[in-house]
Amino acid sequence: MIHGLLGRKIGMMQYFTAQGMAIPVTVIAAGPCIVTQIRTPERDGYSAVQLGYEEVEPRKLTKPQQGHLKASGGKMLRYLREFSADDPQAHTPGEVVTVELFRPGQKVDISGTSKGRGFAGVVKRHGFRGGPKTHGQSDRHRAPGSIGAGTTPGRVWKGQRMAGRMGGTRVTIQNLEVVEVLPEQNLLLVKGSVPGARNGLLQIRKAVKG
């Protein structure tokens, strides 16, 4: 069995359980994905299954990408990602993998690109409390304050938290619970929120710690 799937975030909604409890869920359009390549220890040094997602016009892919996909079934796919599997050799290029890979109650890890926030200050980016608001203080209300000592160490430490670009990075949330699987619509309902904006690409994998 392959341990993951690609999908897109649709949005969030309420889901009512049989007991009438309302829980927040994220709706994900998961798959169908197509197996495009099998990685083997003999040739590649590791075992994995490469999946392709979302058909696209050939002109939007480079010639090497088109050649790679023609060799594995012919469908032109926008995204290619690798996932581990119990037995990669049991799968063949061209095989379709659907959302039925998952089951309600299962724990999954979901990776996506967080929303970009642009250039942000230390209060927003790192949660600094800022300086005093009164007693003659001016222009320093949201400033970081000191960024180091004096002669020793005579420099600013690596990793010092400062203002800068915030968001737009890969984020993984672990152990999210699958609430419902809808194979007819290729939909996956997951409890809680997942990284990124609506329509963002997601990698849904079997939980490492679950």
Curated annotation (Swiss-Prot):
Q: Name one Pfam family in it.
A: Ribosomal_L3
Q: Molecular function (GO) terms listed?
A: rRNA binding; structural constituent of ribosome
Recorded hits in InterPro entries, A to Z, give:
Ribosomal_uL3, Ribosomal_uL3_bac/org-type, Ribosomal_uL3_CS, Transl_B-barrel_sf
Superkingdom of the source? Bacteria
Region (Disordered) residue spans: 126-152
Looking at the UniProt record for this protein, which Gene Ontology cellular component terms does it annotate, in alphabetical order?
A: cytosolic large ribosomal subunit
PROSITE patterns recorded: RIBOSOMAL_L3
Question: PANTHER family of this UniProt entry?
Answer: 50S RIBOSOMAL PROTEIN L3, LARGE RIBOSOMAL SUBUNIT PROTEIN UL3C
Function statement: One of the primary rRNA binding proteins, it binds directly near the 3'-end of the 23S rRNA, where it nucleates assembly of the 50S subunit.
Q: Which family does it belong to?
A: Belongs to the universal ribosomal protein uL3 family.
NCBIfam families, alphabetized: L3_bact (TIGR03625)
Subunit info here reads: Part of the 50S ribosomal subunit. Forms a cluster with proteins L14 and L19.
Q: Kindly provide the name given to this protein in its UniProt entry.
A: Large ribosomal subunit protein uL3
